[in-house]
Design a protein with these regions (language model features):
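Nucleotide/phosphate-binding catalytic cleft detector across ATP-hydrolyzing
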Residues: 1, 178, 182-183, 187
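RNase III-family endoribonuclease catalytic core
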Residues: 2-116, 120, 124-125
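Short acidic capping loops at alpha-helix termini that bridge into adjacent secondary structure
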Residues: 128-131
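Pyridoxal 5′-phosphate
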Residues: 134-135
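N-terminal and secondary-structure boundary signal
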Residues: 138, 142-145, 188-190, 196
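C-terminal edge-of-domain segments
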Residues: 142-163
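Cofactor-cradling patches in redox/metallo enzymes
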Residues: 164-180, 192-205
Length: 208
């Protein structure tokens, strides 16, 4: 990877609204009659930011780390995905300078809770609120009222000499360690039996 002082990443995600599931956006549960369909919790904002962070250091995308259809990530908190992207960013020798996002959805209205959502995302990223921007637009005249979309751009700055990006074998080890943590939590909190480790199948298809 070129030893540039700054790099830019772009991320995009979209999900269809679905009845009977909670609406998760920006790490928050919003009061709305429908949620977003997805294998995980469908958090369109965190997914877009995650892909932007991974893209900034050319580390792949969500599907590279969390294979589509893997039952381990069914209804998973998208903060898990974001944390892994931050680890990749740190490994490459970079940190978040700022994040700019635009949500596109007909409802619910985001502006009344944008400040709270910014605070939540900033906390997840480990940055100040002045480094996170969350805007919202409506898809007027596009017949997309049944869909939520998010565009995210991140600027990252180098804080140390970049290390060599992880090999696929190292990525597998990271995923296994993460899965072990999830298994422990499920076992301790919900009494779910631990699952055997299986060799992950990598696919760039978006699982979310």
């Amino acid at each position: 990877m070129a030893k540039t002082d700054i790099r830019i990443g772009f991320g995009y995600d979209s999900h269809e609204f679905k009845a009977g599931v909670p609406l998760r956006i920006g790490g928050m549960t919003l009061d709305h009659p429908e949620g977003l369909a997805g294998h995980s919790d469908g958090d369109v904002l965190l997914h877009a930011i995650t892909d932007a962070l991974l893209g900034a250091v050319a580390a792949g995308d969500i599907g590279s780390f969390f294979p589509p259809g893997d039952p381990r990530w069914k209804d998973a908190d998208s903060a898990i995905f974001l944390n892994l992207a931050l680890e990749e960013l740190q490994h490459a020798g970079y940190r978040v300078a700022n994040v700019d996002t635009t949500l596109v959805l007909a409802a619910p209205k985001i502006s009344p809770i944008a400040g709270e959502m910014c605070a939540r995302v900033a906390d997840l990223l480990g940055v100040g609120m002045d480094q996170v921007s969350i805007k919202a637009k409506t898809p007027e005249g596009l017949n997309l009222d049944h869909v939520a979309q998010c565009h995210a751009v991140v600027l990252v700055e180098r804080v140390q000499e970049p290390e060599e990006l992880k090999s696929m074998e190292a990525v597998i080890e990271t995923q296994r360690q993460l899965e072990d943590v999830v298994d422990d939590l499920l076992s301790q909190v919900h009494g779910v039996p631990k699952k055997r480790v299986v060799t992950p199948v990598y696919d760039t298809e978006d699982i979310t």
